[in-house]
Protein backbone atom coordinates (compact mmCIF):
# COMPACT_ATOMS: atom_id res chain seq x y z
CA UNK A 1 0.00 0.00 0.00
CA UNK A 2 2.90 2.36 0.66
CA UNK A 3 3.70 2.43 -3.04
CA UNK A 4 0.16 3.29 -4.11
CA UNK A 5 -0.49 6.98 -4.71
CA UNK A 6 -2.92 8.64 -2.32
CA UNK A 7 -5.10 11.58 -3.32
CA UNK A 8 -6.75 13.95 -0.83
CA UNK A 9 -9.79 15.37 -2.61
CA UNK A 10 -12.21 18.16 -1.72
CA UNK A 11 -14.68 20.54 -3.33
CA UNK A 12 -14.80 24.29 -2.78
CA UNK A 13 -17.35 26.89 -1.82
CA UNK A 14 -16.03 27.57 0.72
CA UNK A 15 -18.72 25.62 2.49
CA UNK A 16 -19.20 22.67 0.15
CA UNK A 17 -18.82 19.03 1.09
CA UNK A 18 -16.88 16.66 -1.15
CA UNK A 19 -20.11 15.01 -2.28
CA UNK A 20 -19.93 16.50 -5.78
CA UNK A 21 -16.49 15.15 -6.63
CA UNK A 22 -17.23 11.91 -4.79
CA UNK A 23 -20.43 11.04 -6.64
CA UNK A 24 -19.56 12.85 -9.85
CA UNK A 25 -16.12 11.57 -10.84
CA UNK A 26 -13.87 10.26 -8.05
CA UNK A 27 -15.76 7.36 -6.48
CA UNK A 28 -16.43 3.80 -7.71
CA UNK A 29 -20.07 4.76 -8.36
CA UNK A 30 -21.53 7.91 -9.87
CA UNK A 31 -24.99 9.42 -10.16
CA UNK A 32 -26.61 8.93 -13.56
CA UNK A 33 -27.18 12.34 -15.13
CA UNK A 34 -28.66 13.27 -18.47
CA UNK A 35 -25.97 15.71 -19.63
CA UNK A 36 -26.35 18.04 -21.35
CA UNK A 37 -30.10 17.87 -20.63
CA UNK A 38 -32.01 18.05 -17.38
CA UNK A 39 -31.86 15.04 -15.10
CA UNK A 40 -35.37 13.72 -14.29
CA UNK A 41 -36.68 13.81 -10.74
CA UNK A 42 -36.31 10.96 -8.24
CA UNK A 43 -35.70 8.08 -8.07
CA UNK A 44 -32.07 8.82 -8.88
CA UNK A 45 -29.86 6.05 -10.19
CA UNK A 46 -26.26 4.97 -9.62
CA UNK A 47 -23.92 3.36 -12.10
CA UNK A 48 -20.34 2.11 -12.13
CA UNK A 49 -17.94 4.99 -12.73
CA UNK A 50 -15.67 4.15 -15.69
CA UNK A 51 -13.52 7.21 -14.96
CA UNK A 52 -12.70 6.42 -11.33
CA UNK A 53 -8.98 6.39 -10.57
CA UNK A 54 -9.26 3.82 -7.79
CA UNK A 55 -7.51 1.26 -9.97
CA UNK A 56 -4.20 3.11 -9.51
CA UNK A 57 -4.63 5.37 -6.47
CA UNK A 58 -6.33 5.52 -3.09
CA UNK A 59 -8.70 8.47 -2.70
CA UNK A 60 -9.55 10.25 0.56
CA UNK A 61 -12.68 12.38 0.17
CA UNK A 62 -12.51 15.24 2.67
CA UNK A 63 -15.43 17.23 4.05
CA UNK A 64 -14.10 20.48 5.58
CA UNK A 65 -15.28 21.06 9.14
CA UNK A 66 -18.94 22.08 9.16
CA UNK A 67 -19.75 20.52 5.79
CA UNK A 68 -21.01 17.08 4.85
CA UNK A 69 -20.14 14.51 7.51
CA UNK A 70 -17.52 16.62 9.32
CA UNK A 71 -18.54 18.17 12.63
CA UNK A 72 -16.81 20.04 15.42
CA UNK A 73 -16.21 18.14 18.64
CA UNK A 74 -15.18 19.14 22.14
CA UNK A 75 -14.90 22.87 22.81
CA UNK A 76 -14.15 23.85 19.23
CA UNK A 77 -15.94 26.83 17.70
CA UNK A 78 -16.73 27.70 14.12
CA UNK A 79 -14.17 30.50 14.03
CA UNK A 80 -11.47 27.90 14.71
CA UNK A 81 -12.06 26.50 11.21
CA UNK A 82 -14.02 29.02 9.12
CA UNK A 83 -11.41 31.34 7.69
CA UNK A 84 -8.76 31.14 5.00
CA UNK A 85 -5.88 30.41 7.36
CA UNK A 86 -7.98 28.30 9.72
CA UNK A 87 -9.24 26.18 6.85
CA UNK A 88 -5.72 25.63 5.52
CA UNK A 89 -4.46 24.65 8.96
CA UNK A 90 -7.33 22.23 9.69
CA UNK A 91 -7.05 20.56 6.29
CA UNK A 92 -3.28 20.22 6.59
CA UNK A 93 -3.40 18.79 10.11
CA UNK A 94 -5.94 16.18 9.00
CA UNK A 95 -3.71 15.12 6.11
CA UNK A 96 -0.62 14.93 8.34
CA UNK A 97 -2.46 12.84 10.95
CA UNK A 98 -3.98 10.56 8.32
CA UNK A 99 -0.61 9.85 6.72
CA UNK A 100 0.96 8.97 10.06
CA UNK A 101 -1.99 6.95 11.39
CA UNK A 102 -2.29 4.77 8.30
CA UNK A 103 1.41 4.44 7.52
CA UNK A 104 1.28 6.35 4.25
CA UNK A 105 4.20 8.74 4.70
CA UNK A 106 6.11 6.92 1.95
CA UNK A 107 3.21 6.97 -0.51
CA UNK A 108 3.18 9.36 -3.48
CA UNK A 109 0.91 12.15 -2.21
CA UNK A 110 -1.46 14.38 -4.22
CA UNK A 111 -4.01 17.09 -3.55
CA UNK A 112 -7.12 17.50 -5.72
CA UNK A 113 -9.25 20.59 -5.16
CA UNK A 114 -12.17 22.10 -7.07
CA UNK A 115 -13.09 25.79 -7.33
CA UNK A 116 -12.28 27.30 -3.91
CA UNK A 117 -10.51 24.01 -3.31
CA UNK A 118 -7.80 25.28 -5.67
CA UNK A 119 -7.23 28.18 -3.26
CA UNK A 120 -7.10 25.61 -0.47
CA UNK A 121 -4.64 23.52 -2.49
CA UNK A 122 -2.16 26.39 -2.71
CA UNK A 123 -2.27 27.10 1.01
CA UNK A 124 -2.21 23.46 2.12
CA UNK A 125 0.68 22.69 -0.21
CA UNK A 126 2.73 25.47 1.38
CA UNK A 127 1.69 24.53 4.94
CA UNK A 128 2.68 20.89 4.43
CA UNK A 129 5.95 21.71 2.71
CA UNK A 130 6.98 24.00 5.58
CA UNK A 131 6.56 21.01 7.90
CA UNK A 132 8.47 18.50 5.82
CA UNK A 133 5.56 16.93 3.95
CA UNK A 134 6.48 17.13 0.27
CA UNK A 135 3.76 16.48 -2.28
CA UNK A 136 4.18 14.67 -5.59
CA UNK A 137 1.53 16.71 -7.35
CA UNK A 138 -1.39 19.10 -7.04
CA UNK A 139 -4.49 18.79 -9.24
CA UNK A 140 -6.54 21.93 -9.86
CA UNK A 141 -10.17 21.43 -10.97
CA UNK A 142 -12.09 24.50 -12.20
CA UNK A 143 -9.23 26.59 -10.89
CA UNK A 144 -9.63 30.20 -9.85
CA UNK A 145 -6.54 32.01 -8.62
CA UNK A 146 -7.75 35.59 -8.91
CA UNK A 147 -11.29 36.40 -7.81
CA UNK A 148 -11.27 39.46 -10.05
CA UNK A 149 -11.86 37.10 -12.95
CA UNK A 150 -15.21 36.13 -11.43
CA UNK A 151 -16.47 39.54 -10.33
CA UNK A 152 -15.66 41.69 -13.38
CA UNK A 153 -14.70 44.79 -11.36
CA UNK A 154 -14.89 48.21 -13.07
CA UNK A 155 -11.90 49.33 -15.13
CA UNK A 156 -10.33 45.86 -15.10
CA UNK A 157 -9.79 44.21 -18.48
CA UNK A 158 -8.43 40.89 -17.22
CA UNK A 159 -11.78 39.10 -16.63
CA UNK A 160 -12.94 39.84 -20.17
CA UNK A 161 -9.68 38.59 -21.66
CA UNK A 162 -9.59 35.28 -19.79
CA UNK A 163 -13.30 34.57 -20.38
CA UNK A 164 -13.27 35.22 -24.09
CA UNK A 165 -12.03 31.77 -25.24
CA UNK A 166 -14.86 30.21 -23.22
CA UNK A 167 -17.38 32.47 -24.93
CA UNK A 168 -16.06 31.37 -28.32
CA UNK A 169 -16.01 27.66 -27.42
CA UNK A 170 -19.60 27.94 -26.17
CA UNK A 171 -20.71 29.58 -29.42
CA UNK A 172 -18.97 26.86 -31.43
CA UNK A 173 -20.67 24.12 -29.41
CA UNK A 174 -24.13 25.65 -29.93
CA UNK A 175 -23.45 26.25 -33.64
CA UNK A 176 -23.83 30.02 -33.49
CA UNK A 177 -20.98 30.76 -35.90
CA UNK A 178 -20.73 31.11 -39.65
CA UNK A 179 -20.09 28.03 -41.77
CA UNK A 180 -16.35 28.63 -42.09
CA UNK A 181 -15.88 28.76 -38.33
CA UNK A 182 -18.25 25.88 -37.57
CA UNK A 183 -16.42 23.56 -39.95
CA UNK A 184 -13.19 23.94 -37.98
CA UNK A 185 -12.37 21.43 -35.27
CA UNK A 186 -12.71 22.71 -31.73
CA UNK A 187 -8.93 22.52 -31.31
CA UNK A 188 -8.15 24.50 -34.46
CA UNK A 189 -10.89 27.02 -33.72
CA UNK A 190 -9.69 27.65 -30.17
CA UNK A 191 -6.09 28.02 -31.31
CA UNK A 192 -7.30 30.79 -33.60
CA UNK A 193 -9.35 32.32 -30.78
CA UNK A 194 -6.40 32.35 -28.37
CA UNK A 195 -4.18 33.95 -30.99
CA UNK A 196 -6.80 36.64 -31.60
CA UNK A 197 -7.24 37.20 -27.86
CA UNK A 198 -3.53 37.71 -27.26
CA UNK A 199 -2.65 39.65 -30.39
CA UNK A 200 -5.74 41.75 -31.09
CA UNK A 201 -8.41 41.68 -28.37
CA UNK A 202 -6.17 42.29 -25.38
CA UNK A 203 -4.20 45.14 -27.03
CA UNK A 204 -7.48 46.75 -28.10
CA UNK A 205 -8.80 46.75 -24.53
CA UNK A 206 -5.51 48.08 -23.20
CA UNK A 207 -5.83 51.09 -25.50
CA UNK A 208 -8.78 52.26 -23.43
CA UNK A 209 -10.23 55.54 -24.67
CA UNK A 210 -7.37 55.99 -27.14
CA UNK A 211 -8.77 53.32 -29.48
CA UNK A 212 -10.20 54.81 -32.68
CA UNK A 213 -13.73 54.13 -33.88
CA UNK A 214 -12.31 52.35 -36.90
CA UNK A 215 -10.20 50.05 -34.73
CA UNK A 216 -13.09 49.45 -32.37
CA UNK A 217 -15.47 48.47 -35.19
CA UNK A 218 -12.88 46.10 -36.62
CA UNK A 219 -12.52 44.34 -33.27
CA UNK A 220 -16.32 44.25 -32.83
CA UNK A 221 -16.64 42.52 -36.20
CA UNK A 222 -13.98 39.99 -35.17
CA UNK A 223 -15.80 39.38 -31.90
CA UNK A 224 -19.06 38.74 -33.75
CA UNK A 225 -17.35 36.26 -36.05
CA UNK A 226 -15.87 34.32 -33.12
CA UNK A 227 -18.89 34.38 -30.78
CA UNK A 228 -22.00 34.85 -32.89
CA UNK A 229 -23.00 37.83 -30.74
CA UNK A 230 -23.88 40.84 -32.88
CA UNK A 231 -21.13 43.40 -33.44
CA UNK A 232 -23.52 46.22 -32.42
CA UNK A 233 -23.90 44.57 -29.01
CA UNK A 234 -20.13 44.32 -28.65
CA UNK A 235 -19.77 47.95 -29.70
CA UNK A 236 -22.41 49.12 -27.22
CA UNK A 237 -20.68 47.12 -24.48
CA UNK A 238 -17.38 48.84 -25.29
CA UNK A 239 -16.02 45.45 -26.42
CA UNK A 240 -16.45 44.02 -22.91
CA UNK A 241 -19.24 41.57 -22.07
CA UNK A 242 -19.59 39.96 -18.65
CA UNK A 243 -20.12 36.21 -18.46
CA UNK A 244 -23.76 36.51 -17.43
CA UNK A 245 -24.44 38.96 -20.23
CA UNK A 246 -22.90 36.67 -22.81
CA UNK A 247 -24.78 33.59 -21.61
CA UNK A 248 -28.04 35.54 -21.81
CA UNK A 249 -27.30 37.20 -25.15
CA UNK A 250 -25.96 34.23 -27.14
CA UNK A 251 -29.38 32.65 -27.78
CA UNK A 252 -31.68 35.46 -26.72
CA UNK A 253 -33.60 35.39 -30.02
CA UNK A 254 -34.54 31.74 -29.39
CA UNK A 255 -35.68 32.55 -25.86
CA UNK A 256 -32.88 30.47 -24.33
CA UNK A 257 -30.04 31.07 -21.92
CA UNK A 258 -26.75 29.20 -21.47
CA UNK A 259 -25.57 27.47 -18.30
CA UNK A 260 -23.02 29.25 -16.12
CA UNK A 261 -21.28 26.19 -14.66
CA UNK A 262 -21.52 24.10 -17.84
CA UNK A 263 -22.25 26.10 -20.96
CA UNK A 264 -23.49 23.03 -22.86
CA UNK A 265 -26.73 23.36 -20.93
CA UNK A 266 -29.62 25.46 -22.22
CA UNK A 267 -32.56 26.82 -20.27
CA UNK A 268 -35.64 28.90 -20.93
CA UNK A 269 -35.03 32.64 -20.91
CA UNK A 270 -38.25 33.76 -19.26
CA UNK A 271 -37.62 37.47 -19.73
CA UNK A 272 -35.49 38.14 -22.78
CA UNK A 273 -35.34 41.88 -22.14
CA UNK A 274 -33.20 41.27 -19.04
CA UNK A 275 -29.47 41.92 -19.08
CA UNK A 276 -28.88 38.72 -17.10
CA UNK A 277 -30.87 35.48 -17.11
CA UNK A 278 -33.23 34.68 -14.25
CA UNK A 279 -32.26 30.99 -14.20
CA UNK A 280 -28.98 29.09 -14.46
CA UNK A 281 -29.54 25.86 -16.44
CA UNK A 282 -27.74 22.78 -15.12
CA UNK A 283 -28.45 19.12 -14.48
Positions of predicted regions on the chain:
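Active-site signature of alpha/beta-hydrolase-fold catalytic machinery across serine-
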Residues: 123-127
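Helix-loop module immediately N-terminal to the HCX5R catalytic loop
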Residues: 84-101
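Alpha/beta-hydrolase fold catalytic core
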Residues: 207-283
